[in-house]
Amino acid sequence: MAKEQQQATDLNEKLIAVNRVSKTVKGGRIFSFTALTVVGDGNGRIGFGYGKAREVPAAIQKSMEKARRNMFTIALNEGTLHHAVKGRHTGSKVYMQPASEGTGIIAGGAMRAVLEVVGVRNVLAKAYGSTNPINVVRATILGLTSVKSPEMVAAKRGLTVEAISE
């Protein structure tokens, strides 16, 4: 249990969006709040969560818990991506490509938060279509999980890394 707590504390947490939503009932409207968060270790692990509650802090806490339970591992290359990649979820499309050292994170909104917590320091990225934060986060994570390192490609093809890079 102590090791699990230690692991959870060294994660970077970012709140992307808080939204007030309502349910209409016979007596009027019932308001509640939703929160979208991402957590990452800055070294290739990332998770996202979406929580809903009657109060904002409770919604944020729920989404953070879901994000910690829903972690993915991304193959990074010294603070950038191995190759250009596209991601798509419903109406949101994202394109990300590696950038040279010193470029920084050139991305907007929800995509920037995802790239910061996962540990990408240099990337060029663009979101097309719907900019709904939930869909952009999902599209970005789908794109990042499809990144393959040269070692992964070599293992899959049964070749050496040198043979692939020629």
UniProtKB/Swiss-Prot annotation:
Nucleotide-binding found in the keyword field: no
Entry keyword annotation includes Metal-binding: no
SUPFAM superfamilies to which the protein is assigned, alphabetical: dsRNA-binding domain-like (SSF54768), Ribosomal protein S5 domain 2-like (SSF54211)
GO biological process terms on file: translation
Any one GO molecular-function label of the UniProt entry: rRNA binding
Family under the similarity heading: Belongs to the universal ribosomal protein uS5 family.
Name of this protein: Small ribosomal subunit protein uS5
HAMAP family the record matches: Ribosomal_uS5_B
Function, as annotated: With S4 and S12 plays an important role in translational accuracy. Located at the back of the 30S subunit body where it stabilizes the conformation of the head with respect to the body.
Keywords: Ribonucleoprotein, Ribosomal protein, RNA-binding, rRNA-binding
Domain characteristics, as noted in the entry: The N-terminal domain interacts with the head of the 30S subunit; the C-terminal domain interacts with the body and contacts protein S4. The interaction surface between S4 and S5 is involved in control of translational fidelity.
Subunit structure: Part of the 30S ribosomal subunit. Contacts proteins S4 and S8.
One cellular component (GO) term of this entry: small ribosomal subunit
Domain of life: Bacteria
Occurrences of domain S5 DRBM (ranges): 11-74
One Pfam family it belongs to: Ribosomal_S5_C
